[in-house]
Amino acid sequence: MCGIFGYCNFLIEKTRGEIIDTLIEGLQALEYKEYDSSGISIQGDELKSLNIYKQTGKISSLKEEIDLYNLNKNLPFISHCGIAHTRRATHGGLRRANCHPHNSDPSNEFVVVHNGVITNFANLKALLVAKGYVFKSDTDTECIPKLYKHIYDTSIELGYNLDFHVLTNLVLKELEGSYGLLCTSSHFPDEVVAARKGSPLVIGVKGKTDMDVNFVEVEYLDQEEDYLKLNTQTKSSGNVLAAAPVKYNTCLRKSPPLRSQYLRNSTTSTFNHGSSTETPAENGLPRPMEFYLSSDCASLARYVSKVVYLEDNDIAHIYDGELHIHCSKIGSEDFSFRTVQKLELELSKIKKGPYDNFMQKEIYEQCETTKNVMRGRVDAFTNRVVLGGLENWLTELRRAKRIIMIASKSSFHSCLAARPIFEELMEVPVNVELALDFVDRNCCIFRNDVCIFVSRSGETTDTINALNYCIKKEAVTIGVVNCSGSSISRFTHCGVHTNTGPEKGIATTKSYTSQYIALVMIALWMSEDLVSKIERRKEIIQALTIIPSQIKEVLELEPLIIELCDKKLKQHDTFLLLGRGYQFASALEGASKMKEISYVHSESILTDELGHRVLAVASDNPPIIAFATKDAFSPKIASCIDQIIERKGNPIIICNKGHKIWEQDKQKGNVVTLEVPQTVDCLQGILNVIPLQLISYWLAIKKDIGVDLPRDSAMSAPDI
């Protein structure tokens, strides 16, 4: 799956062209998430009609597809709801029929866009096919709009006219798996519902006048009386979706809608809605409003400054300029409101500026982002680290008998990089776990464990699943994320925000170095009461303060790296990266970047495992990149590099400035050196990884690869 975007205007006139442009711009803001098709749904020319436009390829192909219909783009809509989606093929291959949005039938009575995975879709599909529904795609999503239609038709046959959010709740009760979805319907004109379970959704709110509102009340659904009960046993063969009548209740539509007085397309359907806490009427009249819905808050930055993050099991219902949030799951830990938060994103930070692409911009931003993660937290005068987000849990954290860091992808590598300093400073066992494997193994977790969850987006599905597992085991949880309103930031007990800003490139660059520093700061803060570590802590804190300026020095290597890629590297499709100690994590991260961005096979190897098999490969002269900066392992790394040179390999050595050991080999042309500033051993990996980021970037550029949208990459792991 990939990106969701929606736009609703109420009593604010917009032309069809403006609505289409808004939806397209919203999708373009989500382009940094890898996708292979896109689509939108908007209101048609006829009363209570919806049109769908979708196409494979880039969003530009979708725009061309829309233009083929010669739509009247000047047609005004005083109120309207449109939805859009970019898709990365998961269930079903890349063909137009599999693109979102998906419909319930040829007349588009219900239209859905969806992120996530419906795990019981095969059973639902079989049941719906038995009912006469025809499926045109191979996706799991298509069962959702058809289920909407089936339940809606069944309720009408029984004499019940359900409200949209009640109907949605009935549909969601039949779904297993994860979802973030938007649904519009010709039966509910100018309305949209949004539902979340395991896949993020955020709603931006904008009025013509300022609103002094800080929360939206949650309206809990009465599961016994407030909707029809559907008895669906999808795990048994031969069963069908059936409805049992229930008594008349207040969720059934009864009174004429407000829209008949104000909107261009009035309707004779009847319903009854409660009042909205978020968008109260102004002087007794409805307030002109705009709502923007997305799976990523970064896409909302240009439109709104106030957002509401949906929680799992939430159903948001937007109609008549009002936002209602319903929840079907009542628990002791559930809040009765959703906070309206200020969106702390600057528009300039989500634009390329003078750079050719986002990856290049984000590599160069590391001078600033490493400052940002330390700002107000690292005090070089007192040699202290202050982490306000952890203070309330100080006692529990310092009492930890074990620390477990859990992450995926590059975040996992940052955890590996920080593990040795945690072990050294804290003197407790430290485990680093891949989130998916951690959950699969049902690891033993105890109440005196501290579990640290690291994620760039804060929405990585595997990491969230691991977090939920640890919460059930009553461990103390820390979140290290870049997005303050993300699931991980909200569900953990405490946390550290990396303040990295939006990272729109697929490749993790600035987030990796910021996570690395954040984890080191946590280790420093948690070990503050250990007297034996005072001098070591001072050394690290002083080194942290000059890291941003040292990164600037490393970036000056770019001309040399461009020449190296052009003359020696671009013709190769296999690379070996050698590292040991702190630098093995750098080798892992560098190899990952080269695979992801440059489309080359790259392998990270512990230097002392440079046995006969690896040396046999080295004799074929693939480029070998070795991390040989000064630390406790330098002599052994030098010995391994000598073996490579003896076998006529020509390694590229990342070493410290002024390190004379390689001068003779360099003069003979046996090696190429990339010299970086020296820092304390536990921070050297921050500087060492940047040349690999630049090599990956320039190899891709030399091969005409789109670095911001590499193939077969995704920002967050799907729920599979």
UniProtKB/Swiss-Prot annotation:
Location of the SIS domain: 393-532, 565-710
Name the UniProt record assigns to this protein: Putative glutamine--fructose-6-phosphate aminotransferase [isomerizing]
EC code(s) of this entry: 2.6.1.16
Residue span, Glutamine amidotransferase type-2 domain: 2-321
Keyword Ligase tagged: no
Catalytic reaction equation(s): D-fructose 6-phosphate + L-glutamine = D-glucosamine 6-phosphate + L-glutamate
Coiled coil (residue ranges): none
Function of the protein: Involved in amino sugar synthesis (formation of chitin, supplies the amino sugars of asparagine-linked oligosaccharides of glycoproteins).
Region listing for Disordered, in residue ranges: 266-285
Polar residues bias spans: 266-280
Catalytic residues identified in the record: C2
